[in-house]
Amino acid sequence: MTDDDRIKLEPSWKAALRGEFDQPYMHQLREFLRGEYAAGKEIYPPGPLIFNALNSTPLDQVKVVILGQDPYHGPGQAHGLCFSVQPGVATPPSLVNIYKELQRDLNIPIASHGYLQSWAEQGVLLLNTTMTVERANAASHAKKGWEFFTDRVIQVVSEQCPNVVFLLWGAHAQSKQKLIDGTKHLVLKSVHPSPLSAYRGFLGCGHFSRTNSFLEQRGMAPINWALPPL
């Protein structure tokens, strides 16, 4: 049995990523994570939710990709979808600004929670390029191997899916543009929605309406960005 036979992953992704789990970088990443757990470190998101982005949005259903950097590092926040937090947790500042732009762009009322699962289930792949983090230690798992894996995820979407909208917010996300075939897909870029930068162009970018226009022009259902109440 190979390592990728033991990973609990949605079937379409498992087929597309078969072989990644036997790559040397993945063995090194797995050893790093084992060591962190063995040392008693608290790692987010919880193990069953590490691949939640892929498990919530099958490859053949991807319409939109939003890239984040690494998971939230506070207790109870991260659940494997970038920018999203678990129910009952305060909405983080960057997500508040995303909601402000949704309100300005599409007149969608600001949600009372930060749980973006309904976006994922409509085909919005909410992918952090680093998929784990140590509690209270931002970027602690950067450059440990996750980036090789998530770069491959981005490439697979670009290669195998038609007419995807990639939302690249901030320099880190925009560094992944080289992995995307811009002749097949729509790439929209802006500064990050963080309070440090949102007022320099994220607020006013119109990415959500532009995404839906692109999808509708190609005969695809638009994303309902309004979140259901919890």
Swiss-Prot record:
InterPro entries: UDG_fam1, Ura-DNA_Glyclase_AS, Uracil-DNA_glycosylase-like, Uracil-DNA_glycosylase-like_sf. It comes from the Bacteria. The gene is ung. It comes from Pseudomonas putida (strain GB-1). Belongs to the uracil-DNA glycosylase (UDG) superfamily. UNG family. This is Uracil-DNA glycosylase. It is an enzyme of class 3 (hydrolase). GO terms for molecular function: uracil DNA N-glycosylase activity. Disulfide bonds: none annotated. Pfam families: UDG.
